Structures are given as C-alpha cells and as structure tokens.
Amino acid sequence: MDRRLLLSALLFIALACSSNRVHGALNRHSFPEGFLFGTGTSAYQYEGAVDKRGQNIWDTFSRIPGKIADGSNADIANDFYHRYKEDLNLITAMNMDSFRFSIAWSRILPNGTISGGINKEGVEFYNSLINEVIAKGLKPFVTIFHFDTPQALEDKYGGFLSENIVKDYVDYADLCFSLFGDRVKLWNTFNEPTIFCMNGYATGIMAPGRCSPYASASCAAGGDSGREPYVAGHHLLVAHAEAVRLYRARYRAAHGGEVGITQVSHWFEPYDAGSAADRRARRRALDFMLGWFMHPVAHGEYPPAMRRLVGGRLPAFTAEQSEMLRGSFDFIGLNYYTSNYAVAAPPPNKLHPSYLTDNWVNATGYRNSIPIGPPAYTPIFFNYPPGLRELLLYVKRRYNNPTIYITENGTDEANNSTIPISEALKDETRIGFHYKHLQFVHKAIQEGVKVKGYFTWTFMDCFEFGDGFKDRFGLIYVDRATLARFRKKSSYWFADFLRR
C-alpha cells in the first residue's frame, strides 16, 4: 500500500474513534428545518491552474517582494481545479448541506469584458463543478467577486477606482446568471467589500496595494488612503445594486433564486462601559466597518456618522442610485471572526486623512492587558463567541431583521512544519470554537434573528492572501509538499454534529 494512503487510513481510524461528541446536546436538529450547514472557499485561494485563466490583481500583487508573508503565491494553491471531485467527497463526509465557492472573473472573461472573449474552458469547469456539487447532494452558494479584479481592467482604467467597472461587473454577473442560474439559487455579489476597500486602498496590504505615502512607504502603486477606499466602495455598491436589479428583472421569475451581499464585521464593546464617549465610539466603529456597505443596501445612503466625519471625500449617491440600492438584497451574508473594545480617539490629523482614522476610534483586543477572548494564531483575532450573538442582534435591530447567512466563521493555527501531521490534525481548539459560536447562533435564533445558515471558514487549509500559507483555517489539512488532504479532528466532529 502507498505509504501516504496507509498513513491516511491510520489517521482516519484514530481520529474517527476520538471524535465522539465532546460537548452537550446541541446538534443539527437543534436548528430550524432547512437551516444550511456548509463550508466555504474562494477561487483564487483554492483553484490554482493559473495558466487556464487571465491574470488578476492578486497574481500581480503576490509577485511584489515582501507583500506575501511567506513569499508564496496561489499559482497552484490547493489545485482544486483538478481535484474538485475528490474534494467534494470530503464535504459530504462531514454531512454538510452546502458548498460556498466563488467564480474567478478572469477564468470566465480573461480580459475582464464580454468583448474581450469568453473562456469556454472556464465555463466548462464551473458547469462541471456546479453539477458535481448538486450530484453530491450539496446546495451551491456562489460568490461572484472575491477580491480578484481582472488585471486587464486594473490596467485599462484602474479597476474599482473607475465608474467603468460598474458596466463590466454587471456584464460579468449577467453572464454568470445566464450560464449557471438554472442550478444556482443562492448568489452573493461581493465578499467583504470593507476588507477589499480598506486593505486594497487604505493600508495597501492587499491587492491592488494602494495607499498614501504616509500610510506606508511600501505602496509603490501610489494611492490616497483618505479618498480611494470610498471611491472604490462607491462603485462597488452601485455595481452590486445594478446586478441585483438585473437579476430581479431578467432571471428571478425563471430561476427562483436569491441574491445577497456578504458583509464582514467585528463586534465592538465600549472599552469603558461607563464612558459615554466609548459607547459612541462603539457605534461609530460599527458604522464604519459594517454600516459602510450595509447601510446603503438597507437605507439607500451611507451612515450619518460617515457622512459627517468623512465629508466631501465620501461620494454621494444620486437619487436613482439611492432608490436602486435601498432593499437591494434578499439576504445578507455575515462574516465574523473576532470582537474588539472601542476607545474614543482624538480628532485625526487632517493633513493625513485615512479611512482607518476617520471614525475617531481606537480598537483594541485588550483591556487592562486582558484579552477580550483567547487570542488566535492571527494576532488580530480573539475567540469571543458572545460577540457573534451581539452582532446578529444588532443587525436585527438596526436593519429591520434581514435574513442572514453566517457565510464565514473560523479560527486558525500556525502552519508548523516541525510537528508531525498526526499532531497537526488534533484541532480541539477549532471544535470548541465552532461549538461555542453555534451555541450563540442558536440563542440569537431563539431571540428572533432570521439566521438561515452557518458556513465554516474554511473547507481546507489554503492561501490566506497576505499571510500566504503561514496559517491554517481548514477543517481539512493540506500537505503543502504533496497537496495530500488529511481530515482534521474537527471534520469528524462536524460529521457527528451534523448527523441526520
């Protein structure tokens, strides 16, 4: 027997035997009928096969020395492009209901536009993937854009800094709806626009790597940290609204699907609960992180705090755009990883404006040197399950109780090549993380929040953008040298938790 197969078989036996339910009575049947349990991926982080698509901004960014923590790239990634059929078997083995993945814009349209040509091989790949997902008894949950702007459009007009992106994105979304919408019933226009705009245009630590010189000397692409994040976000919101309007007019009646947008937010607690200034800071922190993209799709305008503090650097919606944005979702995706304390900050330096300081808030994970929750491997993340319930209740109150899918929740550990794989698979911390968060999701549902699903991040260890492969979020371990897959203990725990 192949040594890797033998090792995998032995690990299967050991971990399966130790995967008995280690927590209380909560399980799949505790949640409402039809509740979706799933796991997620994204195209650039998983697919590989870079030679079979057009270039995107991450292909360019990852080749700039120093931009990726471990110097890696995602040319091969997890080679999901060639291994998806066997990989989907791992998802069904965990008794999941749904698989969340994204379509690579440049794999469908290598030059970013319809006129630039459609890649038939790319279309065939996604058709085959969707068909296989359904054949496995899984519901496809598809993201149209997950940070990977075609490089051709970045070169042509600056990507999301130009209003030209709106038409090209809507054309691309239209093509996706027409090609795959007969089988895909859950569409997500954009993933985490806050992260895309903040780190792509304010800090420069993610593609396209733009920021002001005073924000970072390493932003060789140039930029304006006080203006460009808002410009890119504005065009993204208009593109989202146009795509939703098109779907509702052209496809919804025939396909019967739904379209949403995935937001991301920390929960924030006031550093000093007795301080009115810190309580106001908590509200501003939520407005700038969640409200930036949630308020427009719910109310047709930016949060009042953003309009007041950002002023003329924040673009204004036309009356038509505002009307189009208002209610432009059937559901909200919500990604949650951590909570912070919000501390009222003094007015920022007017000569150095930045999205990062416009909210007049200092966020920290520590109060009196005590963390808000156990720190994860990624230093900005803290394990604080009550924060997810608080965030869900906040969205319910502030935004008229929308339908919510928790589209990402997860924790990581270091990619430590010095320990045996058999030890790396023992991820008890991840089991406790998900169980405790699911307890608070269950509680929020009992309190009237319309949560319809919970997706782990991530299905298997993958390229984590600026961190490269140095951390592992997956339920499945990937050996970077061989790309062999090994089930972690958490994957067996989910199989037990989700037993039908």
Curated annotation (Swiss-Prot):
It catalyses: Hydrolysis of terminal, non-reducing beta-D-glucosyl residues with release of beta-D-glucose. The active site is at E192 (proton donor), E408 (nucleophile). It is an enzyme of class 3 (hydrolase). SUPFAM superfamilies: (Trans)glycosidases. The gene is BGLU28. Disulfide bonds join C211-C219. Pfam families: Glyco_hydro_1. It comes from Oryza sativa subsp. japonica (Rice). Belongs to the glycosyl hydrolase 1 family. Glycans are attached at N111, N362, N409, N415, N416. Coiled coil: none annotated. The keyword Nucleotide-binding does not apply. Keywords: Disulfide bond, Glycoprotein, Glycosidase, Hydrolase, Signal. One of its GO terms (molecular function) is beta-galactosidase activity. A beta-D-glucoside binds at Q45, H146, N191, E192, Y337, E408, W457, E464, F465, F473. It comes from the Eukaryota. Its EC number is 3.2.1.21. Residues 1-24 form the signal peptide. GO terms for biological process: carbohydrate metabolic process. This is Beta-glucosidase 28.
